[in-house]
Amino acid sequence: MIWLMAALAAAAGAPAPELVQCRMMECSWSRPVSNVAIRSTAAGTLRKVTALKGTSTYRDDPPSGFDRSIPIEWEKPAAVQYVLCSRSRPALAFRSGKRWIAHALDLFDLPGYHIASAIGYLRACHGVDYGREDIDQAMRDLGYRPGTRSGQVEIARPEVQMFDLPRSERE
């Protein structure tokens, strides 16, 4: 009985899952575990973000946010991402299998495969929801401008390479 009360108390203090995006009858969810600054320079602050990742399905209309009635399947262990909070070089790196993939983000002109990274970036760096109606103005108010580098590249050590991402062959 004591372990049940402890588990309920821990769950009550945990942040609510955040909706990342929904597509093709499936939604991606994230539940933050930690968000720690690990290095700062004049170019920006590198953050190590740990979160549980999950998925749910829907039939008709996707949910607009978390509701306790939504069954979410959570992956284990928690996923780690590196986020370079920078007005001039915003970027996010995530693990894909055994590789690290980094997305350099032009937050005003995102290809579809960068949207989840932009959502994670804005939440990690500013606590801002990318889905808000005035997102372009909100990003300008935060100091971002259109036209920053946009691309995807494979890297080996995100904690080192995020400040100077190599160029991809397509850039």
How should each PLM-predicted stretch be described?
Residues 1-11:
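Sec-dependent N-terminal signal peptides
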Residues 13-171:
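N-terminal secretory-pathway/extracellular module detecting exported/lumenal segments
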